[in-house]
Each structure stands twice: as structure tokens, then as C-alpha cells.
């Protein structure tokens, strides 16, 4: 079925062209679905014999053997029916004591830091309204009115 057979010689070709484009894939689908698979070489012509060779594919090689089990580095333990030895309670006690001691040290350091922070003198207001920290060295020098950069003779 060719396009020139469908196109009329004297009229518009669009309807027939659209019909051809719509039906051509369907025609190919019908031909593929009605085809029969080849079952033997007796139905094959000489031109096809060279292409298909009608031989069964060679068998697949056997799968490789499974790997051997891993070797144990130590001698295998004898199968015993006795209960496993109970863990000593000392190891658990040592861990608990270590955690408690570490917690006490942490809390002691925290209390010391908080005590020093509370004991520190609060900020005082300077004459011009800015906040100045009172440290022991700076407060004694600032009230004397001595210039820090002045040389002592």
C-alpha cells in the first residue's frame, strides 16, 4: 500500500494522507501479531538458512562451586552444655563509681565558677554614665588621678 495509490490524482490529498498515516502503524501491528514463530528448519528457505542457523544455543557453563567455609584461626571450642560463666558484678560497679566521681568533679567545678561569678563586684556607673568594671588595681589607680603613662623619677 503506497502513498501514491491512496492519493487521488485530481483532488485534495489531505484526507487520504491522514488516513494513511493513521492506518499504517496499525497494519504493521496486525502483521506482527499474525506472524508465527519458526519451529523447525524444514520451513526455512535457503536465503534464510544462512541467517538463522536453526541450532539450539550452546549450553551455559556450569556455575562455579561455592567457596569453602572460612577457616577458624583458633581451635574450635568444644560443644558444652554448661551455662556460660556469669559476668562479675565488679565491672558494673567500677563503671558506676567512675560516673559518679566524674559527676561530682563536674558539679564542684561548676559551683566554684558560679561562686566566683557571684562574688565579683558588680559594674559601677562612671561620671559620664558609662559602665566601668571595678577591678582591684584599676579602682585604686583611677581615684588617685595618676597618669598611667607618666614616668616615675
Swiss-Prot record:
Residues 114-153 are cytoplasmic. Changing residue 131 to A: No effect on ACHE tetramer recruitment to membrane rafts. Keywords: Cell junction, Cell membrane, Disulfide bond, Glycoprotein, Membrane, Neurotransmitter degradation, Signal, Synapse, Transmembrane, Transmembrane helix. Residues 1-35 form the signal peptide. Its main location: membrane. The proline-rich attachment domain (PRAD) binds the AChE catalytic subunits. This is Proline-rich membrane anchor 1. It comes from Mus musculus (Mouse).
Amino acid at each position: 500500500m503506497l502513498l501514491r495509490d491512496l492519493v487521488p490524482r485530481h483532488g485534495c490529498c489531505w484526507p487520504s494522507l491522514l488516513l494513511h498515516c493513521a492506518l499504517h502503524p496499525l497494519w504493521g501491528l496486525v502483521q506482527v501479531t499474525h506472524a508465527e514463530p519458526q519451529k523447525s528448519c524444514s520451513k526455512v528457505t535457503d536465503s534464510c538458512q544462512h541467517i538463522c542457523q536453526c541450532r539450539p544455543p550452546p549450553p551455559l557453563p556450569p556455575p562455579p562451586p561455592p567457596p569453602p567455609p572460612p577457616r577458624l584461626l583458633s581451635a574450635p571450642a568444644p560443644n558444652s552444655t554448661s551455662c556460660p560463666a556469669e559476668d562479675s558484678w565488679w565491672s558494673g560497679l567500677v563503671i558506676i563509681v567512675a560516673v559518679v566521681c566524674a559527676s561530682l568533679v563536674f558539679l564542684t567545678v561548676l559551683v566554684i565558677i558560679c561562686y566566683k561569678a557571684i562574688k565579683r563586684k558588680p559594674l559601677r556607673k562612671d561620671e559620664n554614665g558609662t559602665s566601668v568594671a571595678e577591678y582591684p588595681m584599676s579602682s585604686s589607680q583611677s581615684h588617685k588621678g595618676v597618669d598611667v603613662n607618666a614616668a616615675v623619677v
